[in-house]
């Protein structure tokens, strides 16, 4: 299963979230039907754009708690000093994808940025 980890600025639109996921899947060479879940930090729970895309795709939306993001931080490949200072992890999208995928999840696409949103893809044998 592929988990899309999402980071975004406050108020990011559904179209922007959908676009960054589509770009990530294309870069990784995956069809949309390989996507099994969308993950984002729990503090993004009010972001309607992320929820709308999960609903549109018929996928579970997994809200990752801060301790779980931090536990996955060592497995992140990208690093933003600004994000680290603000969020406590080097990459929100990567940490969310890895944490939601579980301890055996592996990044198959490091964080990409498209406008106000970021997406990273992790692969896992687990189901959400």
Regions found by a protein language model. Give the residues of each.
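Predominant activation on well-ordered alpha-helical scaffold segments within soluble catalytic domains
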Residues: 18, 22, 51, 93-99
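C-terminal edge-of-domain segments
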Residues: 94-128
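Conserved mixed alpha/beta catalytic, RNA-binding, or beta-rich assembly cores of soluble enzyme
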Residues: 1-36, 40-42, 122-128
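Generic secondary-structure signature for well-ordered alpha-helical cores
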Residues: 22, 26, 30, 40, ...
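Structural motif
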Residues: 2-4, 36-37, 62, 105-108, ...
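Long, charge-dense
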Residues: 41, 47-92
């Amino acid at each position: 299963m592929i988990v899309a980890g999402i980071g975004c600025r406050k108020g990011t639109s559904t179209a922007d979230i959908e676009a960054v996921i589509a770009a990530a899947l294309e870069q990784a060479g995956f069809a949309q039907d390989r996507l099994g879940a969308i993950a984002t930090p729990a503090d993004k729970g009010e972001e309607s754009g992320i929820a709308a895309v999960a609903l549109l795709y018929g996928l579970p939306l997994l809200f990752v708690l801060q301790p779980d993001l931090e536990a996955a931080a060592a497995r992140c490949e990208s690093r933003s000093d600004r994000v680290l200072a603000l969020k406590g992890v080097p990459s929100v999208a990567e940490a969310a994808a890895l944490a939601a995928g579980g301890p055996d999840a592996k990044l198959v696409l490091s964080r990409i940025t498209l406008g106000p949103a970021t997406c990273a893809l992790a692969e896992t044998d687990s189901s959400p």
